[in-house]
Amino acid sequence: MLTIADKTFSSRLFTGTGKYANSQVMATSIIASGSELVTMALKRVDIDNRDDDILAPLIKAGVNLLPNTSGAKNAKEAIFAAKLAREALGTNWLKLEIHPDPKYLMPDPIETLAAAAELVRQGFIVLPYCHADPVLCKRLEEVGCAAVMPLGAPIGSNKGLASRDFLEIIIDQARVPVIVDAGIGAPSHAAEAMEMGADAVLVNTAIAAAADPIAMGRAFKLAVESGRMAYEAGLAGTINHAIASSPLTAFLDQTA
């Protein structure tokens, strides 16, 4: 079980809502994945309309909603969007995203830290999307973020854990849950993140853009579960030379 702030989750796979062919495929894929926390961009939904094509199936599925501020270019815009979401959806949970560059969608660390501090002060449960920067993640933790969401690779790139070395440091020093977000393009990437000790992963493009999103949702579910199980079991260490799994000398002595 994973606890973040005031909620406990049995699934460590969080999902997004973008890039699906239609809302029915989205909802069915999310259900197949077992995800209990689903993020959605405020700019893509009519948050005042419970019958919205994206919002309605999520409410019906009974998942926890995590509105995000994707599209915000600075702290002021993100804080404004957060207040709208809280009023319309009745949740103080927020995935904080601030990326002023539309080409690479890199999170702005300065604006993110400033917005996070203010949103926490205003009572939000803040989960910030950020660079895999151990110093920044520690600062976000110190201002009161409920978790940190460092990127594995650029959003939608499917390149996996390009920032692995830094993710390992973040996981080692964090005192709040670490959710690897962005760049996870295959179930094996998700399993790798979980084996490292990440508390959860967030996946969107890899499921939504798959030939069979529903089957891919199930595949990610199993990958996250197996990766976490492997981490808890304790992975065998790596070495630079061979060690026989069966003693060879005893066999030779018996045949002499």
UniProtKB/Swiss-Prot annotation:
The active site is at K95. Its EC number is 2.8.1.10. Signal peptide: none annotated. InterPro entries: Aldolase_TIM, Thiazole_synthase_ThiG, ThiG. It is found in: Cytoplasm. One of its GO terms (cellular component) is cytoplasm. Pathway: Cofactor biosynthesis; thiamine diphosphate biosynthesis. GO terms for biological process: thiamine diphosphate biosynthetic process. It comes from the Bacteria. 1-deoxy-D-xylulose 5-phosphate binds at G156, A182, G183, N204, T205. Belongs to the ThiG family. Homotetramer. Forms heterodimers with either ThiH or ThiS. Catalyzes the rearrangement of 1-deoxy-D-xylulose 5-phosphate (DXP) to produce the thiazole phosphate moiety of thiamine. Sulfur is provided by the thiocarboxylate moiety of the carrier protein ThiS. In vitro, sulfur can be provided by H(2)S. This is Thiazole synthase.
